[in-house]
């Protein structure tokens, strides 16, 4: 019989009074029990720290990096840097990434239960076509880039052509971009939260893509200030010949903002020529257009 069984049998045979006394004696010999258990408060959930804003290069690299998936990361990074330095869509990339940064927390919270998370790459999948940015499959050939094997056996990224292409987009803001992405298939739960965010003027990011002003186009097409001044007059105008002697008028000056006639580069000779046109009663039908062009004001009538 084990010692435990013997103790139990001995206690069972004791009279009730002795049994209670024995139990009290045993309890007195035991060390005191621990005090009340201290309740540890549960950690208070804290708001997530604001995430770093996504800039244009981060979006560019995320979207086009797969073009060089056959290379290790060490080789891909220089290629991406070279492409970014010559990329013509910096404004578009900055805009797309700014919109994403402003609504990223909403997209993550509202779509937490979705299997397909709205990551930066997923967002760009819909935003890039809307903005008219070149897709992955057309980017390198459209901009004249090619991977060339060098004599030493290494592969380098080289630009073998400089093709021309036109960007033709309408002015757009963040809400317009988000709406067009939805039309293209982007699915967002409880989208009204995102719409409210992008509708707030204090958080809106406006991106303009207006066509060049006709005077800017003219300035870009000529480096001759004399030719620019001569273009202000009809071919047979009496003062047209005088324009050949005015060489101090720079076309970019007339595109600057400020008080007319007070900026550096202002020509009194040019003011005299304009005054002559205004006082000439035999103005041709082209003079109103030429004056509007010179003063950079809209045509009336």
Curated annotation (Swiss-Prot):
Single biological process term from Gene Ontology: positive regulation of mating-type specific transcription, DNA-templated
Alphabetized InterPro entries for the sequence: MATalpha_HMGbox (IPR006856)
Keyword Signal: no
Primary residence: nucleus
Locations listed in the record: Nucleus
GO molecular function list: DNA binding, bending
GO CC, any one term: nucleus
Keywords associated with the record: DNA-binding, Nucleus, Transcription, Transcription regulation
Residue ranges of DNA binding: 49-104
Stated role: Mating type proteins are sequence specific DNA-binding proteins that act as master switches in fungal differentiation by controlling gene expression in a cell type-specific fashion. Transcriptional activator that induces the transcription of alpha-specific genes.
Family the entry assigns: Belongs to the MATALPHA1 family.
Designated name of the protein: Mating type protein mtA-1
């Amino acid at each position: 019989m084990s010692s435990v069984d013997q103790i139990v049998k001995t206690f069972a045979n004791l009279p009730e009074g002795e049994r209670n006394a024995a139990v009290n004696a045993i309890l007195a010999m035991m060390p005191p029990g621990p005090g009340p258990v201290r309740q540890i408060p549960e950690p208070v959930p804290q708001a997530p720290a604001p995430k770093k804003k996504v800039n244009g290069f981060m979006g560019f690299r995320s979207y086009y990096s797969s073009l060089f998936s056959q290379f290790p990361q060490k080789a891909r990074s220089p290629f991406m840097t070279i492409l970014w330095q010559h990329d013509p869509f910096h404004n578009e990339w900055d805009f797309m990434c700014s919109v994403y940064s402003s609504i990223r927390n909403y997209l993550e919270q509202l779509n937490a239960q979705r299997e397909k998370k709205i990551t930066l790459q997923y967002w760009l999948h819909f935003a890039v076509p809307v903005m008219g940015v070149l897709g992955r499959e057309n980017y390198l050939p459209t901009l004249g880039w090619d991977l060339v094997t060098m004599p030493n056996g290494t592969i380098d990224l080289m630009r073998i052509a400089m093709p021309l292409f036109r960007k033709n987009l309408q002015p757009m803001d963040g809400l317009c971009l988000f709406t067009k992405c939805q039309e293209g298939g982007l699915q967002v739960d409880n989208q009204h939260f995102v719409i409210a965010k992008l509708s707030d003027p204090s958080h809106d990011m406006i991106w303009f893509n207006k066509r060049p002003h006709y005077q800017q186009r003219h300035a870009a097409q000529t480096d001759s200030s004399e030719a620019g001044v001569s273009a202000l007059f009809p071919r047979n105008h009496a003062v047209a010949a005088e324009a050949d002697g005015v060489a101090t008028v720079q076309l970019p000056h007339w595109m600057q903002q400020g008080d007319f006639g007070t900026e550096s580069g202002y020509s009194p000779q040019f003011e005299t020529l304009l005054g002559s046109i205004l006082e000439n009663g035999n103005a041709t039908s082209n003079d109103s257009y030429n004056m509007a062009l010179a003063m950079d004001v809209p045509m009336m009538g």
